[in-house]
Amino acid sequence: MKVAIIGGGVAGIAAAYTLLADKNVTAVHLLEATGRYGGRARTDTTSIPGFAFDKGAQYIQDPTLNPLTAIAKKLNFDTVEEDAVYRLRVETEDGWETLPTTEPQVQAVVDEIQASFDENSKKPNVIVAGKPRKIEEVQLFGHATSTYGPFTESAETWQYIAADRAREAKGDGEENLFVVKGIGSLVAAWGQKLRPTSGSTYVEHFGAVVSKIAYDDDKVTLTYDSQSLTVDACIVTVPVSVLGDGSIAFEPALPDAHRNALKVLRLGSYKKLALRLRTSPADIVPGTNYYLAEDDPPGVWQYYRLPHADDVLIAHAAGDFAAALDRLPDSEVFKLFKTRIQTACDGVFFTTGRAMTNWSNEPAARGAYSYTAFTGGGPDDPNALKARDALATPVKRVYFAGEATDPSCYGTLQAAYFSGERAAVAVLHDVHAA
């Protein structure tokens, strides 16, 4: 049995390991558009010397349930518990102060969003909560600190359906684990073990941009660059943004259910920047995450210093704010953040070393992680809620994986892992049966 995998992220790597464990598999070809393993798990180790800046996935979530915990241990990657607290940084009559995220006015907004979610999630096609009529600091903070806000979902509460989030599996309640050398480095190291452990059965093709997938009942033929590859089955793990914009042509066209799913499954926006500090500012305590409102474009920065790397200041933006920042030159974004943080905090000075992400403009990603968009229709319309399962359904010998196909923990690395494993098991079952 000869199988192709498109995409070298966590889903593709998990699929490869699962397939290669079966003695009936004679060849596994992994085609990756970039020159590396990892997908949206990517660590930058050069922009800030001595610091591993995770540009995508930040940490191992639900460590007792997440396969990456065991992989990190096996590959000798040290981890550190997050153990974070969260605070607001606000300007008051007495100057700048650090306040609890449960400030009454902010908590009232959070409670409103929760009540809206509780009610709206009873129907399959209703948004979490409406867009605020006025964009004021209290509203920005409320949406930023809500568990349904953009820092969790990469989309705003008025952009995605509540019922999709309501299916999310309960986590283990344990602290997230930072990977000291970077979670992207961990995933890359895991992928790089495939060839040494599998010999000639495994072939990796980096820089292979797949442009067409032709399939029938018995085989799949991939076209990439000026080459083609025919296999017994193919697992597609590329992001829904790439599938949805027609970058890969399917012959014949995918069924209506898949095409409709790709209209509502989208990638949100999430942005990170990191700057090396020249000083150790007393207003930014390592291990504390602070929320700081920005006026133009309106949004919220989430910034912090890591206990194990307290000489670097990291800032996040999400949702519409991140999308607006992604449209600006990097130099303007750095200037915007530096001006704001130095206004809000004393003693913040920077030295050489900085890094920034822009997933919106990454050709192989075109966004952060998935959400199920509200695109209209009545509250009882079931189609959007069916999108993740619809996309995960095989089409003859073509199988789909990736975090967007997992309803229970979408948007996470473990979702990508489980989906890749699931698709590989389905390939083995179906081809053996045939």
Where are the regions a protein language model picked out?
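FAD-dinucleotide binding site
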Residues: M1-A434
